[in-house]
Amino acid sequence: MTKTTDRRKFLAAATGGSAAIAASSMAAPALAQAAPEVSWRLTASWPKSLDTIFGAVEFMAKRVAELSDNKFKIQVFAAGEIVPGLQALDAVQNGTVECCHTSPFYYYGKNPAFAFGTDIPFGMNARMRNAWMYFGGGLDLMNEFHKEFNVTYLPAGNTNAQMGGWFRKEIKSIEDLKGLKFRIGGLAGTILSKLGVVPQQIAGGDIYTSLERGTIDAAEWVGPYDDEKLGFVKVAKYYYYPGWWEVGPTVGVFVNLEKWASLPPAYKAMLQVAAAEANQWMSAKYDALNPQALKRLIGAGAQLRAFPPDVIESCWKVTHEVLDDVASKNAKFKKIYDNFIAFRNDQYLYTQVADLAMDSYMARLRAQQK
């Protein structure tokens, strides 16, 4: 990696850093005189009610407008206003819209390698993922793969570690998973099905009713702040953790390759900086909102439970069997997978003696002070 390339990646990752701010301020007068007016449409995979996820892409669009002196405008549409949420990538590929804000793992069916744009089960937390994408070669590897789908990808948000879901009954061992009707999809659904779970694909707006009626036994959504809004605590009191299938899930912007190529270099830089700022904005906002939401949920009757050790151990084992099998059959998946796993293992080696040690100590102190 050259010093120039490294600097560009840092500026894109430095979310609102002084260098980016200074550069944009100096460029503004020239842009106002010479820059073309560009109007794009962006379709999101989320409803407006998910105000932190949807709010992040609104924030990104606002920043692009500010940085370009309103010369580059992105109009944001919620899921269903142009296309359904799960068709966002298709709309970008075929040119219906210039870009979308989505979770890449929704498109696992197109090619399993899409999963790396969000996360894989037992993956990396948000900070580790940023390190991998910006400085571990992850983003370059993913965008090399994305070219065949006529898109490029910019990380633009992270929910941080998610919860393990709401359950109508307690999970005491791996045996309790057998026959469990669990609203969960994608790669995690495939893994859990091998342990006897019956995965269910249900839209977010239908989860509450399905739990209430007993159509499903459990459901995962996001985390305390978003889960509280949907009222799950009223119909399923056991709230499990951790959400091992989404340790640090990134959401991001797919841009049509032809549209990306047509952007002036300054506009590309603005979009990269705005997306990186949105990445930090979403993660920080969830960190601010989730603790208080969790307290309220516990006050409303939620029973916090950790998945039993045999459940986690079985999920870990099956996860790597599934991923290794996919890698053996899909060269594009394997190329990213090998890089990802090597980086993940190094990250946890360091975290074990740095963050984890300190976090564990502080958690024990907090418990003692109660």
Regions flagged by a language model, labelled:
Residues T2-S25, L31-R129, G137-K370:
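N-terminal secretory/targeting leader peptides
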